[in-house]
């Protein structure tokens, strides 16, 4: 248990949740309570086009690990949440106090009986349900309280253009080399277009 607590607080993955800092970081379960994807302490969740990484905090059950990479246990128990690049999540998370949390009925071939899953739309907003045998449903579609991941979109493009050809360090100087915003920075920006924001993204 001591090892788990120690590892949960090591910042292995930068988070990219709640880009507008408006509280878009919570799912809810009747038994789990509020599930926080951007907790104040420890590591949060990071969304990529192929997977989720990091940790989330549930007020009634504690830390939930989104990948075996958090504890270097993949050689023994290989688990995690995958993203098919279209926003359809699958796989399992793990909570020390309640066990496995399934993000898709495809995991258990139960979709014909109980059709559920968690999705991420084009704006980065989560929706749907995850399921745990020990605590039941976790709802990602709660009105006014939902999880949203940062995505590179027209807001970022407008901010990038506003810095075009500026000198000196600024959020659009993505190559961190010449201290100006030029075509090299644009090439980096275009590579992230419509994808999830990388670590340290400052163009929101």
Where are these regions (language model features)?
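Bacterial N-terminal signal peptides
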Residues: 1-9
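Disulfide-bonded cysteine motifs in exported proteins
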Residues: 3-4, 69, 106, 192
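Peripheral, non-catalytic segments of secretory and membrane proteins
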Residues: 12-151
């Amino acid at each position: 248990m001591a090892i788990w607590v120690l590892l949960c607080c090591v910042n292995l993955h930068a988070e990219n949740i709640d880009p507008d800092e408006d509280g878009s970081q919570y799912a809810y379960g009747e038994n789990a309570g509020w599930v926080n994807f951007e907790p104040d302490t420890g590591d949060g969740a990071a969304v990529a086009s192929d997977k989720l990484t990091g940790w989330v905090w549930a007020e009634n059950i504690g830390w939930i690990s989104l990948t075996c990479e958090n504890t270097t246990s993949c050689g023994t128990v290989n688990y995690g949440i995958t993203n098919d690049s279209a926003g359809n999540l699958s796989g399992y998370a793990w909570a020390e106090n309640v066990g496995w949390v399934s993000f898709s009925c495809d995991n258990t071939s139960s979709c014909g009986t109980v059709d559920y899953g968690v999705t991420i739309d084009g704006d980065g907003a989560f929706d749907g349900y995850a399921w745990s045998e020990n605590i039941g449903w976790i709802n990602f579609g709660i009105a006014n309280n939902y999880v949203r991941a940062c995505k590179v979109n027209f807001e970022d493009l407008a901010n990038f253009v506003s810095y075009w050809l500026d000198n000196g360090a600024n959020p659009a100087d993505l190559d961190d080399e010449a201290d100006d915003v030029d075509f090299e920075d644009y090439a980096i920006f275009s590579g992230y277009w419509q994808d999830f924001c990388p670590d340290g993204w400052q163009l929101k």
